[in-house]
Each structure stands twice: as C-alpha cells, then as structure tokens.
Amino acid sequence: MSAPELSAIEVAAALERGELAAVDVREPAEWDAGHIAGALWIPMGELAERVSELPQGRLAIVCRSGARSGVVADWLERSGVDAVNLAGGMQAWHAASLPIEPVDGWIA
C-alpha cells in the first residue's frame, strides 16, 4: 500500500481549511532553513518513538524532496494513520512560492 500524494498547492489549501496537519520529518538544519507555518517537527529517525505526539486526523508528511516523507507516510498508513505525502516536498513548496516560517526570523 502506498500513501496518497498531494501537491504543494493542495496541501496548502487543505492546511488553510483545517483539513490536515503538517508533520515535517526533516533534519534540524533543514527545519532551521524554513518550514511550513504550524508544522509539527519530528525528524524521521525519531518518529517511531514519538508517534504518540502526532495530532489526530489527516496528516501531510513533509521532507525536502518527498522521498523520506513518502516512506513515513506509507509506514503511517500501514499503521492505521490517515497520512498523505507532500509530493516534491519542500522543493515543490518553494517552487509554488508558498510561504515558509523561518526560525528566529531569518532563513539560513
């Protein structure tokens, strides 16, 4: 089973409507360079031990390119969590000129 994928535009619209929550599975330096506002940050390597922190409802899983988030979204789907992969990851988010939230007010 493969988790469904949504485009950056589709994820942004669903976030705006409150239909899903974003979970960013990137590493610290990637997160610090900018992330989706309101996203929960749990690096991929910590997810298994922190799965209880995931919000209820549909989740959009985010990484840099969509590869790691695809693996995580598939794993979550197999575990009974309603998860989608952000197709193209933050690269697609940037390409669509969608807003990011910098850490400490600046982008690395």
Residue locations for each model-derived region?
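Rhodanese-like catalytic fold shared by cysteine-dependent sulfurtransferases
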Residues: 1-21, 27-59, 67-108
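Short, surface-exposed ligand- or partner-binding patches at beta-edge/loop junctions that are enriched
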Residues: 62
